[in-house]
Each structure stands twice: as C-alpha cells, then as structure tokens.
C-alpha cells in the first residue's frame, strides 16, 4: 500500500479508548524506568494501529517540493542538453511525469475522501495532488514539434502563467529563433529576463523593445508592410467601434482610409498613422493631391498635347469658377475634369490605369457633408494612436523597424502595451500589430518563402487582443513556420471578446497543445477537462441489509461491489486545486503531462 494511501487500521473510537487505557501504564513506566517507558510507547503506537514509517512518509509528501531555480545565463547550456536528449526533446518544462490511468484512479480515491488545502506552505492548492509521484519526477522534455501547432495556456491570476511563458520565450531565444512577444501588461520582469537571456546567448543586438510609455523604446511602424492601400484601410477599419450609427458608415470609412493611403503612395510619402491622420482630416486634400500628381506626371511626359489639354481644362475651370461659398458644389465638376484628363491620357497611352489615383478621385467626388459623417469615427481612432509619445514611436520621421524586418533578420521583438493604464490605446495597437503579422504571413505564404528560423509569437493576456487577424494567424500561419502561444485566465474572457462561445471555440480549436495551471473558474476547468482523454475508474459500493422475519427471525446481509465507469483522466475538481506553478499539459498526440515549473531568476538574483 502506498504511503499516500495509508489509512489507520483501527477505528478512531477504538484507538481513542485504547489510548486512554494505556495512559496509566505509561505514567507508571515513566516513574520506574526509561527503557520501560520507551518500550511501552512503541507498543502503544502498534496497538493503536499507527504505522510510524508510512505516517512520516505521508507527512513528508504533504510538503510541496522546492521549485527548481534557473538563471538566465544557464539557458544556453540547458537548451544544448535538451536538443541532445534521446527522443529529440528540446523544450524543458521543469520536473514531472506522464499522467496515466493509474494516477487518475488514485486521484479519484483522494477526491472521494476529500482533498485538504496546503495553504500553510504558501503554494495554494492541495497536498494530495502534489504528493502523487512526487519522488518519481523526471525532467520534462517536450518535443519542439508539439509547439508548432500553436498552444493555449489557461490559469487564474498568480498561478504561474507568466512564469511558463517566460520559460518558453527564453528557450526560444536561446535556440536562435525569431521571437515576437506582445505583452499587454508590460511586465518588467519578463522584459528583463528576455534581455538577460539574449545577452547570455550572444543575441543582445537582436533585441528590439517597444514600450507605449516610451521607456527605452525603438521606433516601430506597424503599417509599413502592405501590398496595396486597401490592405491598410482594412486593418484600420477593424479597429472601428462595432454597432451603433458608426456601423452603417463602416464601409465608407474604410474607403476613406484606403484613399488616404493611396494619396500618400502617389505623393511618395511614408505610410504612417500620423500621415494618414493628416490626410483624412481635410477632404480637400484628395482633389488637390490628385491634381498635383497629374500635373507632375504631365511635366515628366514632356508632351505638348498633354500640356495643351491640361491648359484647356484649367481654362474651363477659370471660366466656370464658383464663388467662394459654393466650393462644395463645385467639387464634383472639378473631379469630373480630372477624370476627363485621366481618360484622355490613358486613351493616348500616356498614362496607365492607376488604382491609387482612382481611389483618390472617388473620395474627392464624395459630398463634403457626407464625408464628415463617414470619417467621424476614424478621426478619434487615429488621434489616440498619434498622441503624445506614440507620435514619435509609431510615426517618427526617422528610420523605424517593422515586423518584416524582425522576421527577415531573425530578431527578438518585445512590446509592452500597458493596457492596465490605457486599455483603449494598448488594445488598438496590439490589434494593429496582429494585422501586420497576418499580412507578413500572407505575403510569405503567397511567395512560397518559409523563414529558415521558426517565428515564435507569444501573447500574454490574449483575450485583450482577440480579433479576426488573430484567428487568421491561428488558421493559416503554421504553413510559413509561425507558432503562436496564447495565455489567458478564463474561457469566459475569450467568449466575451469574441462575442460568443463559438468564436472562443474557434480559437481553441486551432491550438494543438493545451497547458492548464490552477483554474479557479468552474467553466474553464470543465472546458479543459472536456479536451482531455478519458479512462476507466472503479467505484466501490457496500450495503448492509436487515430483515426481521417471524418464522426465520432476524436476518442480515452485507454486499460489496466494484464497477467501472468512464471518468476524465484529470477531473475539473482537481484542476481547481492545483498548487501554484504546477500544471498539466495535453500534447497533440493525446499524452498528458503533469509538471512543476522552475523559477527563472535574473543575473542579479542568487539561484
């Protein structure tokens, strides 16, 4: 019988009576001889049914084992050892074991007896869960291919989600992969550990940091990667408010954003958030910009007929010039003349069809009053992303980085969004970044270019950044060697952000590997249990019957039975009682691991 299953043999009442009867004898022995006292004490324990070695072993198992401590400087050597391990395991998850059916049956017995908390040890959870296979734990080495199919991490606040993310991120840095970390919280410890690991691996120069509060940040342009203007317009339109009066104008707002980007392309100006805001603020920019571009184009052609045609159009404009108060009414005829000029140039093969010019002319032809309604929701959006220090970080005049640069050069990128301080700005910027990543993945996929180094994308508090682009990355980015790891507290967070249970299940359905730390939320624990394998557990039952018969007298009977029933390999009730830093992990092949995370210390801390 295992020590963790040892029960006192004698009934509690009998043990108590026997102990009371032995007290006078112990007192008499203590008064005459110490040897007799010790002998009597041992006999008393044996008679009371207390098996001392198992009892001591049981008490020792109730104490949570100390967590392993790693320093950032040790990760390069750890990664090398993991890569050389038998079986090709190259991701270290701490100490643990493969959870099997026998563990599930033992856990069911603990659940039937009732689990006791271990809060006195400061780790939360319950001691029985920790005691299972405590002395048979081995280093957990997860095959790297298991993380390629995307991963999801569930765990309530303070259970170790960030510790697990930190361990996965720092090992990816040590393996030399491209690493992108989007941190809505702005955890300074996480940023410090990434920097220390990068330096320890000789990759200190590869690290780029973007902090929306401007703390030691490098300029970054989340709009620099695109194939056409409509792509940028669609990205920004996804950030617009949903529902209400703005919903009816959303398609027109996207047209205005696209036309603004088209005008910047025609003028050769950088496409940044600030430049788009500058264009979209004034409807007149579209007409004046298109006219200036056509004049410059005709000047480059050095064609006398084209110059004469432009002069005649300008002459007609002068003859039919409207009063100052009728500027809005004269906009349509002015755009019509520009369209006429474009048609004449195309007819004489002096100008090729230009989609960007058509976008600008279409927006210039829009009624001014209607344009104000269309752009009413876009202006506040762009304004928040161009405010204060964000203007220099995201739209600065100097050189800036982009995700195309990060992926192409195999660098390390960390961004702190500080959603706790400004949730609106942080969430919008995070969604813009996910849209840029989806665009990069789409271009690589279309070109058939798979990055040599895997692109690891880690998103903490993923529910803050849920969007259509995140779903697209999960659905399709694996084909270009992208691997996403998402972390969140509860399943309800995903349901709320996606607008329904189906949307949340769509995200989880794309994650092959599932990590779960302690889940205080019952619905989350049940959801994790639903995605785990099942096994057969025995249920014992007993019955005592008494029957009084006039002829046969009193009859009695005792029956015991054991039947098997299907039960989860790790039940939701136990998942809600896991100690801190302990986790279960369901792999893509169906195996279930249970482990204890190590603590990743900094260079300034002692291990």
Set out the residue ranges of the language-model regions.
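Hydrophobic alpha-helical membrane-insertion segments
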Residues: 32, 42, 192, 469-470, ...
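P-loop NTPase motor domains
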Residues: 3-6, 125, 131-136, 144-159, ...
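Conserved H-loop
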Residues: 489-493
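Basic- and hydrophobic-enriched, low-structure N-terminal and domain-boundary segments
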Residues: 1-159, 163-168, 397-401, 560-565, ...
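P-loop NTPase motor core of the ASCE superfamily
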Residues: 5-9, 46-49, 244-262, 402-404, ...
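Active-site-proximal binding-pocket segments
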Residues: 486
């Amino acid at each position: 019988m295992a020590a963790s299953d040892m029960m006192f043999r004698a009934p509690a009442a009998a043990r108590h009576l026997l102990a009371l009867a032995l007290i006078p004898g112990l007192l008499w022995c203590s008064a005459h001889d110490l040897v007799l006292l010790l002998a009597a004490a041992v006999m008393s324990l044996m008679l009371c049914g207390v098996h001392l070695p198992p009892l001591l072993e049981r008490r020792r198992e109730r104490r949570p084992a100390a967590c392993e401590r790693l320093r950032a400087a040790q990760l390069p050597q750890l990664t090398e050892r993991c890569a050389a391990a038998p079986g090709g395991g190259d991701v270290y998850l701490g100490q643990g074991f493969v959870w099997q059916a026998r563990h599930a049956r033992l856990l069911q017995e603990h659940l039937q007896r009732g689990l006791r908390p271990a809060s006195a040890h400061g780790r939360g959870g319950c001691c029985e869960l920790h005691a299972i296979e405590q002395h048979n734990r081995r280093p957990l080495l997860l095959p790297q291919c298991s993380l390629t199919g995307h991963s999801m991490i569930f765990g309530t606040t303070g259970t170790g989600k960030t510790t697990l993310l930190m361990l996965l991120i720092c090992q990816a840095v040590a393996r030399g992969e491209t690493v992108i970390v989007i941190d809505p919280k702005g955890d300074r410890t996480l940023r410090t550990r990434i920097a220390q690991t990068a330096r320890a691996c000789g990759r200190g120069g590869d690290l780029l940091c973007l902090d929306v509060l401007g703390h030691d940040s490098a300029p970054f342009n989340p709009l620099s990667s695109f194939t056409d203007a409509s792509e940028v317009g669609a990205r920004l339109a996804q950030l617009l408010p949903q529902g209400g009066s703005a919903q009816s104008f959303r398609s027109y707002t996207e047209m205005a954003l696209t036309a603004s980007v088209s005008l910047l392309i025609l003028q050769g100006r950088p496409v940044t958030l600030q430049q788009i805001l500058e264009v979209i603020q004034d409807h007149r920019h579209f007409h004046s910009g298109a006219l200036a571009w056509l004049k410059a184009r005709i000047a480059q052609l050095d064609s006398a007929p084209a110059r004469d045609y432009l002069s005649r159009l300008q002459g007609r404009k002068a003859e039919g010039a409207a009063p100052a108060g009728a500027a809005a009414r004269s906009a349509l005829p002015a755009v019509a003349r520009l369209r006429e000029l474009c048609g004449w140039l195309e007819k004489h093969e002096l100008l090729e069809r230009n989609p960007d010019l058509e976008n600008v002319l279409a927006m210039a032809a829009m009624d001014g009053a209607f344009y104000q309604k269309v752009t009413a929701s876009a202006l506040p959006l762009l304004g928040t992303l161009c405010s204060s220090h964000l203007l220099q970080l995201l739209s600065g005049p100097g050189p800036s980085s982009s995700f195309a640069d990060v992926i192409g050069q195999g660098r390390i990128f960390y961004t702190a969004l500080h959603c706790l301080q400004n949730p609106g700005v942080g969430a919008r910027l995070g969604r813009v970044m996910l849209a840029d990543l989806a665009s990069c993945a789409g271009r690589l996929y279309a070109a058939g270019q798979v990055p040599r180094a895997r692109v690891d994308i880690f998103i903490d508090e993923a529910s803050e950044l849920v969007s259509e682009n995140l779903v697209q990355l999960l659905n399709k980015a694996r084909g270009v060697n992208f691997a996403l790891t998402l972390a969140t507290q509860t399943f309800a967070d995903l349901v709320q952000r996606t607008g329904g249970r189906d949307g949340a299940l769509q995200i989880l359905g794309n994650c092959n590997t599932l990590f779960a730390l302690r889940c205080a939320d019952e619905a989350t624990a049940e959801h994790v249990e639903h995605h785990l394998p099942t096994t057969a557990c025995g249920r014992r039952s007993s019955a005592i019957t008494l029957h009084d018969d006039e002829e046969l007298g009193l009859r009695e009977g005792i029956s015991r039975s054991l039947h098997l029933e299907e039960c989860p390999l790790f039940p939701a009730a136990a998942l809600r009682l896991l100690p801190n830093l302990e986790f279960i992990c369901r792999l893509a092949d169906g195996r279930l691991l249970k482990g204890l995370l190590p603590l990743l210390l900094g260079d300034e801390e002692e291990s």
